[in-house]
Amino acid sequence: MKTRDFKFDLPQELIAQVPIEDRASSRLMVLDKETGNIEHKVFRDIIEYLNPGDCLVLNNTRVIPARLIGEKLETGGKIEFLLLKRTEEDTWQALVKPGKRAKVGTKFSFGNGKLIGEVVDLSDEGSRIIKFHYDGIFEEILDELGNMPLPPYITARLDEKERYQTVYSKHNGSAAAPTAGLHFTEELLNKIKEKGVDIAFVTLHVGLGTFRPVKVEDVLNHKMHSEYYMVSQEAADKINRAKENGKNVICVGTTSCRTIESACNEDGKMKETSGWTEIFIYPGYKFKVLDKLITNFHLPESTLIMLVSAICGKDNVLNAYNEAVKERYRFFSFGDAMIIK
């Protein structure tokens, strides 16, 4: 299986640069995973594809404003940190630009000394381990000084930080939003509950590896990044109940999908658990829990389009993506959505 097999042509102007005003009015492509048949809807129509007793799985991670602009304490030279993941209480793995200024022992100041970052170690793939020194509560300082770590393909400025959060975001820790969830409003979620659909919240903190291109020619040689996840007993019970009753488990986003497929046993049973996952889902994978997926339109040759192809076949996916281009759907993080049923 070659990485180039997952390539498609995408005009630059179809990459959404800003979120639309009304989250639920984005477009929705409906893709039948068996026949490849396609329908065109609006996202709030998603309720038509959810039935009483089904379980909708949402990732309630919250994006942290992980991009910090500061200066080297000794020289005043400008520096940019991008926090990737917390390794200990006040210690983070981070990408640093320019890297040559970030030798072990170097200290950097953010917000006129409100936050001091010290390089304590070098990590894999050119990142650094940073120990932070501060007075107060780290999350509050970060909220004040940090910027949202938007994906590299978004060049427009984001004026409201909350537009890059789901309305149900709860647990801080992500370097990117679980973007399929951006389409839901409180009103739509309430209507879904009223229909008798169970909602299960899981947590997976999205790392920047989600945007990292697959650089190997053979898909099987790709090494996935590691991400932290949590599944509560309540969420596990809701998912198990749906499966036991012959109902559907519908994941909102690839992160929810990767969480439940990591957290279940070989029989597809869920339990309360947490840990790190490097699960890589590509065509040939046998899903143990997932029945349907709600997701955005992904980058060519990415692990995300490979995951989607595992559900309904590469040819169906590429056909749907070409149809989306023809119909001028908006792509990537702030773009439109599809449900694979």
From Swiss-Prot:
| UniProt keyword annotations, A-Z | Cytoplasm, Queuosine biosynthesis, S-adenosyl-L-methionine, Transferase
Q: Spell out the protein name for this chain.
A: S-adenosylmethionine:tRNA ribosyltransferase-isomerase
Which enzyme type, at the first EC level? transferase
Query: Record's family?
Result: Belongs to the QueA family.
GO MF terms, alphabetically ordered: S-adenosylmethionine:tRNA ribosyltransferase-isomerase activity
**What GO terms describe the biological role, i.e. biological process, of this protein?**
queuosine biosynthetic process; tRNA wobble guanine modification
- InterPro entries tied to this protein: QueA (IPR003699), QueA_dom1 (IPR042118), QueA_dom2 (IPR042119), QueA_sf (IPR036100)
Q: Which residues form a coiled coil?
A: none
Pathways per UniProt: tRNA modification; tRNA-queuosine biosynthesis
Subunit-structure text: Monomer.
Quickly give the catalysed reaction: 7-aminomethyl-7-carbaguanosine(34) in tRNA + S-adenosyl-L-methionine = epoxyqueuosine(34) in tRNA + adenine + L-methionine + 2 H(+)
One GO CC term, this protein: cytoplasm
EC number(s) given by UniProt:
2.4.99.17
Spell out where the chain crosses the membrane.
none
The entry's function note states: Transfers and isomerizes the ribose moiety from AdoMet to the 7-aminomethyl group of 7-deazaguanine (preQ1-tRNA) to give epoxyqueuosine (oQ-tRNA).
Localization, per the record, is: Cytoplasm
Signal sequence, renumbered to the chain? none
